[in-house]
A protein has these predicted regions:
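Glycine-rich, small-residue loops and helix-cap segments
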Residues: 79-178
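Generic alpha-helix detector with strongest preference for long hydrophobic helices that associate
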Residues: 19-24, 29, 58, 76, ...
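Acidic/polar loop patches that form or flank catalytic/metal-binding clefts of enzymes
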Residues: 9-15, 49-56, 119, 157
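Short helix-loop capping/hinge segments that flank enzyme active sites or metal/cofactor-binding pockets
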Residues: 33-104, 160-168
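Phosphate-binding glycine-rich loops and adjacent basic patches that engage nucleotide phosphates
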Residues: 2-3, 22-23, 55-76, 105-112, ...
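Surface-exposed beta-strand edges and their flanking turn/coil or helix-capping segments
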Residues: 26, 73, 134-136
């Protein structure tokens, strides 16, 4: 931050905004629904000699080869995506509306407008956890600034910021649709 100020940037410190209680559940639902649709589209266009043509095929393949494909971790995310509502369902559309309002209208757009700034900056995310073969990845509750831009679909640029205990961390620069 000091280097940016020295280079002429005006820094305005902003406290993060709150999210509704059902925000993270809604964003996971949208992610699961979209993941299934777009992965199916990608896999269906794979070369003919690749037998996995859909997420359902991939889950079946992983189950048939569990000793290798699931030797350490399962496929909970794939399985929850298979069960996710279709993108034309009211459940999906309601969740999408909630996360767009939270991350766009009440999030990035509001922060830019209310603080009269052109760009938001913050740590991209927490330090990545070490692989834990017993408990799985244990992430902190804080998702990082990059998540707001990722969920909103707005521009986000992440650049290296340094390291913490030898693990690289980044800083995100994001802005609105205009």
């Amino acid at each position: 931050i000091a280097r940016m100020e020295t280079a002429g940037a005006t820094i305005v410190r902003i406290e993060s905004n709150e999210t509704p209680p059902d925000f993270w559940g809604a964003s996971r639902l949208v992610l699961d629904s979209e993941f299934k649709v777009f992965l199916d589209a990608y896999l269906s266009g794979s070369p003919a000699d690749i037998p996995v043509r859909s997420l359902a095929d991939l889950v079946a393949f992983n189950n048939e080869n569990a000793e290798v494909e699931q030797a350490i971790f399962g496929q909970d995310i794939f399985e929850s995506s298979l069960e996710a509502p279709e993108m034309d369902s009211d459940t999906y559309q309601d969740a999408l509306a909630l996360i767009r309002k939270t991350t766009r209208d009440d999030g990035i757009d509001a922060l830019l407008r209310d603080h009269d700034v052109q760009v938001l900056m913050g740590p991209s995310g927490p330090v990545s956890p070490r692989v834990d073969v017993v408990n799985g990845d244990v992430w902190p509750a804080w998702a990082g600034a990059g998540s707001m831009a990722a969920i909103s679909g707005y521009p986000n640029l992440t650049v290296p910021m340094g390291t913490v205990a030898g693990v690289p961390v980044g800083v995100s620069f994001m802005s609105g649709r205009d």
